[in-house]
Swiss-Prot record:
<dbReference type="InterPro" id="IPR002765">
    <property type="entry name" value="UPF0145_YbjQ-like"/>
</dbReference>
<protein>
    <recommendedName>
        <fullName>UPF0145 protein CPS_2458</fullName>
    </recommendedName>
</protein>
<dbReference type="InterPro" id="IPR035439">
    <property type="entry name" value="UPF0145_dom_sf"/>
</dbReference>
<comment type="similarity">
    <text>Belongs to the UPF0145 family.</text>
</comment>
<dbReference type="Pfam" id="PF01906">
    <property type="entry name" value="YbjQ_1"/>
</dbReference>
Amino acid sequence: MIYSTTESIPGKEIEEIVGVVTGNVVQAKHIGRDIMAGLKSIVGGEIRGYTEMLTDARDIAIQRLVANAEEKGADAVVGIRFTTSAIMDGSSEIMVFGTAVKLKK
């Protein structure tokens, strides 16, 4: 499955727009990471535990987007965008969305 933030795939022609597809995940903070984050916020620097958590969450959201596109018979997803939001205290959602398309063979 090809997926891209661009509206087209170089060297490929879009034959049909299948529709909007999404993938999301809600990730909760880990108490150990939260303690380290509190310390890092005092001294500064990257909070690696959160970086890793968000990277994993983004990857899961992309996998779900691809699965959604495959269920609809798409060959690619174009124009993908990411959004984040706080769901409740201590958890965040990462959502990825885009347009599923069929490519000319």
